[in-house]
Amino acid sequence: MTEEIGFELERQQESWFGSWLRWCPTSLSLLREAEKMLLSNLKSLYRGRYVNVGCTVGTEDSHIWTLSFNEESPKIPLVLLHGFGSGVGLWCLNYDALAAKRPIYAIDIVGFGRSSRPQFTRDPLEAEREFITTIEAWREKMNLEKFILLGHSFGGFLAASYAIKHPERISHLILADPWGFPERPLDVGRNSTIPLWVRAIGAILQPFNPLFIVRTAGPWGPKLLQKARPDLIRKFSGVVKDSEEVIPNYLYHCNAQNPTGESAFHALMAGFGWAKYPMIHRMDSLRKEVPITLIYGSRSWVDRDPGFQIKYTRQESYVDVVVIKGAGHHVYADRAEVFNELVNYIGDNVDNGTLPKKMSMNPDLVEGEEARNAGVTLTNMLNVRNDNMQDVTQATVEDTDNPEESEKDAV
């Protein structure tokens, strides 16, 4: 059940499409319907609304599409930033569990999803500043003093950048398989964790926006996504009804529109897997009082060495690195139950004014090569919880036997 506000903005923005609609069968109305289908399985009440953040990018006011859950709770809020090419809908496996604990706010990052799509500057540092300025303007409008900030992939990159700029707002920074942290290697091909087919496609498409092929496919775009990403569809199949249609339909309508956020991402990237200005070189600017948890999937293509580097260089700060065994890049969906338990555990400690016990209790698993290559379970973390969580502590996660899953999970 939901309350949604601000449809008139979507009708105004749809004037952009014009003749484009003759080839790409999309609109903000269709995106709204696709999102509603994706969220129809939720048990939690939520409110969807547009938040006017003023002129933070371009020459006109931007409006940020926002979902909020459990706003009446006095607990510390959790703010969710999605990854590249995504939107608020893909957190659908997490909302119910997380909203049971505290207020949840999820936004479509400016330039993506149902939010405004203004023209960003092509300068990478200035484009990043525009993203961060918009997030801060949204925070001010929402009257959030302090919160837990969780970002996935590109959202993790932006979350880290925001925390560096506004550390006083962050109760805990959670980075889920964050993009853009490592330095691009001189020899990209050698020892790269990014699958060869992704690197090949990335080289061919380097001059273009990453998802232009979805728009080029026109009316065949949803089918293209359905064929290209069956692995992503499977992640949601146990919860989302008709996921084989709903997931690609949602992703298509998220990405078949004016790709301004995508263009800004393209300006920031140095090849698909790297940022022109890697975040690893900037984390020493983050105030030491800000606690950080980095969550990786053991089968993800994202390089997790920067997470361990951050842990070892911020000796005076709380930093924990957790690798969820069997999860890929979409760690929040691959092992949703474990991911939700981990985030709730962190949140409980924030509420109590304590730092979480390190989830990586066993140094043989976490600090050695075994942890870097195979991942760790969350048994030690979950054992500190109440006895009524005993059934969860027994459910340690096993690695998948299908090597293709980590490759398909690359984008």
Regions found by a protein language model. Give the residues of each.
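Alpha/beta-hydrolase active-site loop signature
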Residues: 85, 109-113, 180, 300-301, ...
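Flexible "cap/lid" subdomain of the alpha/beta-hydrolase fold that forms the substrate-access gate
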Residues: 2-46, 74, 125-133, 140-141, ...
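Alpha/beta-hydrolase fold catalytic core
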Residues: 1-78, 100-102, 119-132, 144, ...
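Short amphipathic alpha-helical molecular recognition features
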Residues: 76, 83, 87, 104, ...
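Hydrophobic residues on the short alpha-helix immediately C-terminal to a glycine-rich phosphate/catalytic loop
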Residues: 94, 162, 342-346
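Catalytic histidine-centered segment of alpha/beta-hydrolase-like enzymes
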Residues: 302, 321, 327-341
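Conserved HGGG/HGGXW glycine-rich cap/lid loop of the alpha/beta-hydrolase fold
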Residues: 62-120, 142, 152-158, 165
